[in-house]
């Protein structure tokens, strides 16, 4: 189906965005 790749893309997007939302975690 098409849900699998969609969830993978969403996970990648979230993984990219979260560090920007929580910069303290990067330090």
From Swiss-Prot:
GO biological process, one term: hemolysis in another organism
Subcellular location: Secreted
GO cellular component, one term: extracellular region
Top-level taxon of origin: Eukaryota
Keyword set includes Secreted: yes
Disulphide bridges: none
Entry's transmembrane regions: none
Tissue specificity note: Expressed by the skin glands.
Keywords, ordered alphabetically: Amphibian defense peptide, Antibiotic, Antimicrobial, Cytolysis, Fungicide, Hemolysis, Secreted
Function: Has very weak antimicrobial activity against Gram-positive bacterium S.aureus and Gram-negative bacterium E.coli and stronger activity against yeast C.albicans. Enhances the antibacterial activity of XT3. Has hemolytic activity against human red blood cells.
Protein name as it appears in the record: Antimicrobial peptide 1
Record organism: Xenopus tropicalis (Western clawed frog)
């Amino acid at each position: 189906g098409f849900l699998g790749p969609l969830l993978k893309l969403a996970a990648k997007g979230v993984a990219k965005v979260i560090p920007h939302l929580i910069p303290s975690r990067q330090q």
